[in-house]
């Protein structure tokens, strides 16, 4: 009987989880007098967060409709970077599939896609990430961006997958693509400097961005294009990174 009562109590907690976390008052409590108009912190710090199902957590992380249009593009980029469920990308055989799930279902990214300055702000954010002065290395690592804001390694990996995804077409106009090529190469070099910290996955992410740029620019030979296309489609799983880097950086 005691076991049944305990089980019933646990079910009540889980069932009430989404109601408590999704409560509009909870979202409004996140608002403050600072420039930050939305944050995931108050959602994930809720005592019931760990008891929620994945769907309940994902629903809880949606930005209230009343706030979406009020957020700046920079804030939307930062929210995409700090989404608490970003690590699920690497629960998929192909991490891009996980990233696509978040991009297609998170209303913050959908709003970002509508912004004319989305590509510029995304590039500004990524360019501001310091891959050399890493904290909490070797794992889990934390990386600093502009204004010394701290992001987990998985947060930045998600941004790299966005940059490579093709979901923001304006990233691939001539001006932005040249900048994306330059910035992603610089970040790859920064990671190589800290080869005691960054492994194959992180290095592959840089090369996946570079692969997308190379495929869009039509500068590859037919044979190289096939190799790079396979590398991109497998999200880094089809070839070793030394082979890919030799092709991309000829």
What are these regions (language model features)?
Residues 1, 22-25:
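Generic cytosolic/nucleocytoplasmic N-terminal low-complexity/intrinsically disordered segments
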Residues 2-7:
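Sec-dependent signal peptide recognition
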Residues 10-11, 228:
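Residue-level signal for mature regions of secreted extracellular proteins and peptides
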Residues 13-16:
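C-terminal motif of bacterial Sec signal peptides marking the signal peptidase cleavage site
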Residues 18-20:
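Bacterial signal peptide processing site
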Residues 25-250:
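Non-catalytic all-alpha helical scaffold/repeat segments
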């Amino acid at each position: 009987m005691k076991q049944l009562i305990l089980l019933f109590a646990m079910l009540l907690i889980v069932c009430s989880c989404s109601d408590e976390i999704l409560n509009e008052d909870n979202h409004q409590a996140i608002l403050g007098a600072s420039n930050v108009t939305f944050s995931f912190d108050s959602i994930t710090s809720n005592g019931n967060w760990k008891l929620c199902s994945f769907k309940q957590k994902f629903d809880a992380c949606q930005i209230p409709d009343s706030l979406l249009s009020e957020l700046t593009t920079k804030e939307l980029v930062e929210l995409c970077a700090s989404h608490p469920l970003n690590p699920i990308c690497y629960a998929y055989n192909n991490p891009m599939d996980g990233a696509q799930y978040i991009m297609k279902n998170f209303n913050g990214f959908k709003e970002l896609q509508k912004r004319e300055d989305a590509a510029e702000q995304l590039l500004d954010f990524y360019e501001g990430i310091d891959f050399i002065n890493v904290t909490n290395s070797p794992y889990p690592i934390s990386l600093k961006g502009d204004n010394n804001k701290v992001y987990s390694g998985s947060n930045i990996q998600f941004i790299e997958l966005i940059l490579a995804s093709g979901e923001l077409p304006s990233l691939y106009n001539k001006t932005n693509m040249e900048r994306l090529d330059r910035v992603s190469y610089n970040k790859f070099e920064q990671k190589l400097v800290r080869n005691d910290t960054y492994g194959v996955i992180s290095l592959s992410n840089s090369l996946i961005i570079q692969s997308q740029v190379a495929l869009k620019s039509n500068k590859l030979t037919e044979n190289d294009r096939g190799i790079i296309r396979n590398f991109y489609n497998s999200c880094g799983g089809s070839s070793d990174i030394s082979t890919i880097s030799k092709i991309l950086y000829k």
